Amino acid sequence: AAGASLFAEAGETQLGATVKSNVSQQRVPVTGDAGHWVHVSESPRHVRVIYNGETIADSKHAKLVREAEVLPVYYFPHEDVRSELLSPSQRRTNCPYKGEASYWSIAQGGKQAENASWSYQDPLPAADAIRNHFAFEWNKMDHWLEEDEEIFVHARDPYKRVDVLPSSRHIEVLIDGRLVAETRRPRLVFETNHPVRYYIPQEDVRMDLLVPSATKSRCPYKGPADYWSVKLGEQQFEDMVWGYMEPIPECPKMKGLLCFFHQRGAD
């Protein structure tokens, strides 16, 4: 099958099927030697949840739950939740680390979100700090705010870093043996528990080979991403390239640069 490959500093050790670089691509296990873990801390941020124009939860004492292999989740004290808008449902789920969760649906202004909130009323010892706290299904709510800034996708992990560093590495991107990008001025993005990514100025990319895609995504740490496919003759490699045209203020050095998927082959 045809494939996409990315080379950096020719002659160095190959770290994977498609990447050559002296930058380690190994992921750090989230669980570590201690096995599964659940970490609960009180967030110093003012966090709000809005549904159908109404603030459902509003707290300066929300708990942030970080758990191995699970995205961070905000849990709100009962007194900071509009509990009169919640009605209990029959749904129950069980977590071997936190206990049994009960669910509530939310009704507001003629609109209803089924099983949109859950709580551990009698949690296991590891999660006792979230007893009588309520969490909300992210995508069933309309808006989430930390202080006065809207946040997207999921709660942000305060222990996660995204470092964007200028580099003079020689980077070449080849797809099906054809050079589609070459640069000596990439920006390398080092993100906790993610492989190193190489972001390339558009001037160093064969933009005439890129076709804008309808695909969109959003990262809570970097912002909204646009995608491009690569067209080589009659063959098109879908969504092979992405870039943050308007990154969040914390990542301005990524603005307008393009990155290629170099871990997967091109179908």
For each predicted feature, which ranges?
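Terminal leader/tail segments of proteins
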Residues: 3-7, 11-267
